[in-house]
Amino acid sequence: MLLAVDIGNTSTALGLFSGEELIAHFRIHTDRMRMESEYRVILKNLFALEDLPPPKAALLASVVPPVEREMKRAIERLFGVEARVVEAADTGLEVLIDNPREAGADRLVNAVGALAYPSPTGRYIVVDFGTATTFDLVEAPNRYLGGAIAIGPQTAADALAQRTAKLPRIDLTPPKAAVGKNTLEALRSGLVLGYAALVEGMVRRFKEEAGEALVIATGGFAETLRPLCPCFDVVDEDLTLKGLLRIHLERG
């Protein structure tokens, strides 16, 4: 029984695996101000709510060190198991970038998750929608080749609302048409259709440089963009959690 935890800048995903089956999945707000005791209460309540058995092991991927520290302590105190934080060496990947230490844990774990899918060319492009959107190029059997980082769609929408006097906050749903007839539809066109064009363009450029690849989309915005991005071969919102499971099973 593995508790897999993906700590992102905006939200934290938690998945409980029994063998290779994901039996429970939660998402909570990432709060840098929460203490270990608060995370312990949250975890206790979530497990009680679903009547879940305690994990036998825990593995964390994190891009937020303060939250990582408190979450690790909370898991260890509540369940009495060691909560390991994934390092690059744990992934078994050959990280072929200028400074391998710069590669985010979530991106490397995504790469491990992607490699579980069959790819006709042995290459993968992973698109992860979060606070930032990342594009990563991966090659079988275990090579991480680099990628690109862009602003996340919700981050872009929040920035527009915060830094302009008259533009409102909106929900990121696809518009009826590219040519908006009011401010809300114009914003949705720019933020949703514009973002789809960004994704399609980046994937095309990756393929021009590296060759054909299996494109896997993950993160909260992936499902919204699925009908707008024909470049997606797979949408897997649990890719990071599955990558953590694979590391746990293969590396111990």
Curated annotation (Swiss-Prot):
Keyword annotations: ATP-binding, Coenzyme A biosynthesis, Cytoplasm, Kinase, Metal-binding, Nucleotide-binding, Potassium, Transferase
Cofactor: NH4(+); K(+)
Keyword presence, Lyase: no
Family matches, as SUPFAM superfamilies: Actin-like ATPase domain
Binding-site residues, ATP: 6-13, 131
Binding locations of K(+): 128
Associated pathway: Cofactor biosynthesis; coenzyme A biosynthesis; CoA from (R)-pantothenate: step 1/5
UniProt main location, coarse: cytoplasm
Cofactor: binding details: A monovalent cation. Ammonium or potassium.
Positions of the catalytic residues: 106
BP-aspect Gene Ontology terms: coenzyme A biosynthetic process
The enzyme's E.C. designation: 2.7.1.33
Record Pfam families: Pan_kinase (PF03309)
InterPro entries: ATPase_NBD (IPR043129), Type_III_PanK (IPR004619)
Broad EC category: transferase
Record family assignment: Belongs to the type III pantothenate kinase family.
Described function: Catalyzes the phosphorylation of pantothenate (Pan), the first step in CoA biosynthesis.
Quaternary assembly: Homodimer.
PANTHER family: TYPE III PANTOTHENATE KINASE
Designated name of the protein: Type III pantothenate kinase
